[in-house]
A protein has these predicted regions:
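A beta-strand edge to alpha-helix "cap/lid" segment located at domain peripheries
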Residues: 1-4, 50-142
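Short, low-complexity N-terminal intrinsically disordered segments enriched in polar/charged residues
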Residues: 1-26, 30, 131-142
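Alpha-helix C-capping/helix-to-loop hinge sites
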Residues: 12-15, 35, 86
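A short gly/proline-enriched turn/hairpin at secondary-structure junctions
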Residues: 33-43, 55-59
Length: 142
């Protein structure tokens, strides 16, 4: 099982690194639930999870994980990373330090994902313009 969990986490990172929505979609069980950030209305089911991807990858947006660390225990995994969010339209961005918790089923699909981050884990790179984000707005992404 450890290999299935590690593969799911590795491919999750790869999907973001390559801006690959198809790979991202393939990682999730059809009935999965994804809460990002914790406290937001969860995305329930593959269509809602893919809509979340679209929300974060609007025109000109890229999200690249760096400083990635994983911990695997049984069928669960922790992914710790810095998500470098960049908007090429206006050269703005931010870095979000995240801790994601995933539960993987026997088929190797993610059934539950929870992303832990808040205003205190957001930092501003010095070489680009600030990207304003308000957690409450993010939670109400509709």
């Amino acid at each position: 099982m450890k290999e299935k969990v590690q593969s799911a986490l590795d491919n999750y990172v790869l999907a973001y690194m390559n801006n690959d929505k198809s790979l991202f979609r393939s990682l999730w069980d059809d009935e999965a639930v994804f809460e990002d950030p914790v406290g937001a209305e969860p995305c329930k089911g593959i269509e809602a999870i893919c809509a979340f991807w679209d929300f974060g990858h609007a025109e000109g947006m890229e999200i690249k994980p760096t400083n990635v660390e994983t911990i695997i225990c049984a069928n669960e995994g922790i992914l710790k990373a810095v998500m470098e969010v960049r908007n090429s339209n206006d050269n703005s961005g931010m870095n979000i330090a995240i801790v994601d918790h995933f539960i993987i089923n026997d088929a190797g699909k993610i059934v539950t994902g929870r992303a832990f981050w808040n205003e205190d884990t957001i930092s501003q790179p010095t070489d680009i313009k600030s990207m304003d984000i308000f957690i409450d707005d993010f939670k109400d992404r509709g």
